[in-house]
């Protein structure tokens, strides 16, 4: 997928890190870019920075708090009200090393990394379909390989571990499962979907991981530009146009965890629909 004419992308968490690098690269290619982030100040600063770096006037801000499904709905409504097509949604935003609950009472890492993005994608799916060919790109992680499954009860309480890395792994497994099930449901519509591992990137996602652990994690990390490479590959490469539902690492297909079964993907989808129903009507 190239951009000979202006195409439109929404990138969550594009105020910093991999998301900003992804948004800037697409803006340089002539895309119309929406920076969706929780902080208006940081988001608008990123918009200004991307505009300057890409010499583009087609970069805009959308307010989005993935920890509040009301905000997710408002974000989708704000975009849809503009009447524009949507060719790519990049589910990039994420948190790690945090404790707490979302506004709707879900474990915070799961709520931000999976459930908020699930709702956003559902609310934008009709627009993606009408703009096809279109893609949904979800930034997961190879951390999902360490998740042994989903403890459904744990999704309703704050993280119990010191680092939150167990909860992070489960949230990334959910990203992979979401992409798989969306691929099944969107088959034949012209909307394709991809999950990916960006590499271990020196980004703001690790800022809340406790000090004794953080320095060990951040050694030899990739730059944000290097980390954005696989997101850009999944968003634009013609090589993956027919490879919906696959998992990518270093711009190449990789087998996901054996825990990522179609049965678990369906169960997660159904539960996510139930949990988010009040915000989908």
Can you say where each PLM-predicted feature lies in the sequence?
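A glycine-rich helix->loop->beta "capping" turn
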Residues: 55-58, 78-91, 97-102
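Catalytic loop of short-chain dehydrogenase/reductase
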Residues: 94-103, 107-110, 129-189, 197-214
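Canonical Rossmann dinucleotide-binding motif of NAD(H)/NADP(H)-dependent dehydrogenases/reductases
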Residues: 2-37
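Conserved hydrophobic beta-strands of the Rossmann-like cofactor-binding core
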Residues: 8-11, 89-90, 136
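N-terminal Rossmann-fold cofactor-binding loop
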Residues: 14, 36-40, 44, 66
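C-terminal helical subdomain
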Residues: 171, 195, 218-254, 260-266, ...
């Amino acid at each position: 997928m190239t951009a000979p004419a202006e195409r439109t992308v929404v990138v969550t968490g594009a105020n910093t890190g991999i998301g900003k690098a992804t948004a800037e690269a697409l803006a340089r290619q002539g895309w119309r870019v929406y920076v969706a982030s929780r902080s208006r100040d940081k988001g608008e600063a990123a918009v200004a920075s991307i505009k300057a770096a890409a010499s583009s006037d087609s970069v805009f801000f959308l307010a989005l708090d993935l920890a509040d499904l009301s905000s997710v709905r408002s974000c989708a409504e704000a975009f849809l009200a503009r009447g524009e097509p949507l060719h790519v949604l990049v589910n990039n935003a994420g948190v790690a090393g945090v404790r707490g609950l979302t506004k709707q009472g879900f474990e915070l890492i799961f709520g931000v990394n999976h459930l908020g993005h699930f709702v956003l994608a559902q609310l934008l799916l009709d627009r993606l379909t009408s703009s096809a060919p279109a893609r949904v790109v979800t930034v997961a992680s190879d951390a999902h390989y360490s998740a042994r499954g989903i403890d459904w009860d744990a999704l309703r309480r704050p993280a119990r571990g010191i680092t939150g890395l167990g909860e992070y792994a489960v949230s990334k497994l959910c990203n992979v499962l979401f992409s798989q099930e969306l691929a099944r449901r969107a088959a034949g519509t012209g909307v394709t979907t991809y999950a990916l591992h960006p590499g271990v990137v020196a980004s703001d996602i690790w800022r809340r991981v406790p000090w004794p652990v953080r320095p060990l994690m951040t050694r030899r990390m990739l730059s944000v530009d290097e980390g954005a490479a696989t997101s850009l590959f999944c968003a634009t490469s013609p090589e993956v146009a027919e490879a919906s539902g696959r998992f990518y690492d270093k711009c190449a297909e990789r087998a996901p965890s054996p825990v990522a079964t179609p049965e678990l993907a369906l169960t997660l989808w159904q539960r996510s629909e139930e949990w988010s129903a009040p915000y989908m009507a």
